[in-house]
Structure formats: C-alpha cells, structure tokens
Amino acid sequence: MIRFKKTKLIASIAMALCLFSQPVISFSKDITDKNQSIDSGISSLSYNRNEVLASNGDKIESFVPKEGKKTGNKFIVVERQKRSLTTSPVDISIIDSVNDRTYPGALQLADKAFVENRPTILMVKRKPININIDLPGLKGENSIKVDDPTYGKVSGAIDELVSKWNEKYSSTHTLPARTQYSESMVYSKSQISSALNVNAKVLENSLGVDFNAVANNEKKVMILAYKQIFYTVSADLPKNPSDLFDDSVTFNDLKQKGVSNEAPPLMVSNVAYGRTIYVKLETTSSSKDVQAAFKALIKNTDIKNSQQYKDIYENSSFTAVVLGGDAQEHNKVVTKDFDEIRKVIKDNATFSTKNPAYPISYTSVFLKDNSVAAVHNKTDYIETTSTEYSKGKINLDHSGAYVAQFEVAWDEVSYDKEGNEVLTHKTWDGNYQDKTAHYSTVIPLEANARNIRIKARECTGLAWEWWRDVISEYDVPLTNNINVSIWGTTLYPGSSITYN
C-alpha cells in the first residue's frame, strides 16, 4: 500500500512538472521564432546598397558656353564649362535638426530622406546596447550599457562617460589632434553639397551663401570646412539584427514601420564629436584669379598685401560660423580681415568642460551585413570663369626721314545667344595715308578688341621696291598702351613696339 502511494506521488509530480514546463518551452520557442523572423526577414531583403543610397543631383542638358558684357571701361567674358562630380562619403555631417536621429545606436531607414541628410528614425522597442568612447586613459571604463537606447538615454550615457574622463583623466591625458579640412568653390547647391558633404541649406542659412548671385556670376564664393574631432562614440555592432530588437518585435512590425527593399534598415555605428567651422570667402571681383587668390590667402598670412591680388581682396569679405566648442564666443564672425578668421580657427581648439564637443558627423551601417552606408552623390554643375579685359590704345609715332603709311586693323568680339563667338572687323580710318615726320596719333581700342594687326611701311623711292615693310605684326596683345614707333632713313629704318 505504501509502495503504491509513493508511485502515485511520483507520477503526480512528473505530471505537474510537465504541465509547468510546457508554457516555458512554448514561450522560449515564440521568442526564437520572432528573432529568426527578423534575421531571416532582413537577410532576405533584396537591394543594391549603391543604388538605394544614390543621390542624383542636377542634370544639365544645355547651357550658354560663353557670353560677353561691357561694364564701363571693361569687357568681361564669362566662360561656362559643364562638369560632373561624383562622391561617396561615409561620414555624414550632422546639423541641429537631426541630432535626435543620428546618435550612436540609432536605427534609421536607408531611404531618400537619409540621402538628403534628414534621416527617418526606426522607432521600435529595443534591447540594451553598449556604447564606447575613445577618450584616452579610460581603458576598461570606456564602455557603458544603455538599457533603453533612446536619444535622451544615450546622450545621458555619453555625458556620464565624458564627465568621468574630465574628473579623473583630463589632467593627465591630452587629446590627439584630429582635424579634417576641405575646400571648394561654389557653383551650385548640388555641387557644394556633394563636394563638402553638407546640406546646402546649412551653408545658405548660416553663412548667407547667395546661390543666385553665384549662378549669375555676380559673386564668387569659396567655402572652407574645418572639422576638429575631440572624440568618437561607437555602438557595438550586432552579430545578428535581432540582437537590437526587443523580443516582442517581429519582422512584420519592422515592415509596418517602413522597412522594405527600397528602405532597408541601418544603425548609426559611430558619431564624431568636436567642432566644425565653416568659412565663406566671397568677392564681387570678376577676375579669373579669384580661386588662386583665395587659396593663396588661406596658405600665406602675408599675401593679403600682395599687389597681384589687391583688387580681389579689396572687394572681398569673409564669414565664419562655429558649430560646437565655446560657440558663444565665436558664433558668427563677418569681417574683411582674414586674420580675424584665422583667430576663430585657432581659438578654442582644445577640448575641456568650458569648450565642450558637439556632434559633427556620423556613420551608419546596413543591418543586413554591417556594411557601411555610403551616400553616392552624382551631380552636374556649371563651372564659371570670368576674364576681364580693359580698354587700350595704340600710340603711333613716326620720326623717320621718309614718307610712311600705316595699317591698323582689329576684330571686336561678341557672342550670340548660343554662346558662339561673333567677330566684327574694324579698321583705322587713316590706313594707307601718306605720313611725314614728325607724325603721331592715338587710336583708341575697345576692351573687346582682338586679333590686332599693325603694319608700317616706308617709301624707298626705288623703282623695284617702292614700299618696304618696317613693321608687320599680327595678334598684338591688347594693353593699356601699345607704343608703335618708326624712325631712321629710307636705307636704315628702325622700329619698335612696346607695351605698358
């Protein structure tokens, strides 16, 4: 009887255990199925990462290659050439409006909004993530776990790591200088966005870049971008996409949030913190040497007194905008003295509690394979160069002991509506008239004079060579003063052409 009771008790316990374990096994299987659905769903997404993040800017089919215009004593030839620019940046500039969409560990969609630097955030329940900071000295203290990786909580965790470094290690460790520099002339919004990897609206709003004036050749603008990185914060990459999502999330949930072949999911893998300085060099000069003058000014502190570029610098202004660091001190500086800009760049170059870092750029990866999400920019733009010509004159002087004749001719250039060169031939009304010494005159030339031809001949009195050339020059350059002199005798004539 006792043996029977024991057997019955064991059977009851076994049955209870089976009933208890069944929900656990079922629940565990449900979680596994959800994780597998996310991993297999993201893995099965079909897309070309180069195409899904392609940015096709301006497409230029036709343009006027050349035009000329007279302004006062000047003739300005505007020459346009079609250029193409292709870039594939992996570090994307951060602007204030997207801070809460570009923090370490943030989930995004690789869609058109991402290409335009206004990423779409993928809002779902998340698993904890680890973020790491590369400040020197922290060693094993450089990482922190964020249980619910929202923008606010990740920002708080980063502040905690930075505060720890400031309190314990800033006095014994210095930050290595990591500076990125880029520059470009401005031709269009798409071109400058691709060249500097920054949203053109940022430059338009913060620096006041007048793209219409640039397009109309009323102004020439160069933009400099200085990025000084104080530290970088990275999020651990997942072994599987499902490692990022709460166990309650399914692949269907992700699809409802916008995940598709056209918009695969991304994660912000790292964010660089520091400060960015944008500098605008702007001039109303139409000289073809503007770019060379600006580059010389950037490299050489003494070049501003150079006579070579004096006219350009006198008609230039400079603007600097600082993002990050102690930006209250140098939020925006507008000046005609480039030394003031140098001071802005030099000041506050060291990270401290009084000179904090600012998120300046980020890199994202595709969840499917952790490959870097590079935006592929391709745009056409028109590169415009201006050549300025001034009026000139020909000074004829005849002091020779003989009868002389002159021939002066030139072409005046203009351009039709299609940009084709149109030449109008001009001649001096004193051509081939006998002139005896001493004779002098001035022949004015318009600023659009080209193909200048100057000829002078003397009467020898010889039956077999009645006229002999003293000067015969083609393609004489247009200058302020073209001095043409002839002298001597019929047997020994002399001549010269000088310019000033």
From Swiss-Prot:
GO annotation (BP), single: hemolysis in another organism
Important for cholesterol binding, annotated site positions: C459
Principal localisation: secreted
Outcome of swapping T490 to A/G/S: Loss of hemolytic activity
Protein's UniProt keywords contain Iron-sulfur: no
Motif (Cholesterol binding): 490-491
Membrane topology type: Multi-pass membrane protein
Name of the protein described by the UniProt record: Perfringolysin O
Organism of this sequence: Clostridium perfringens (strain 13 / Type A)
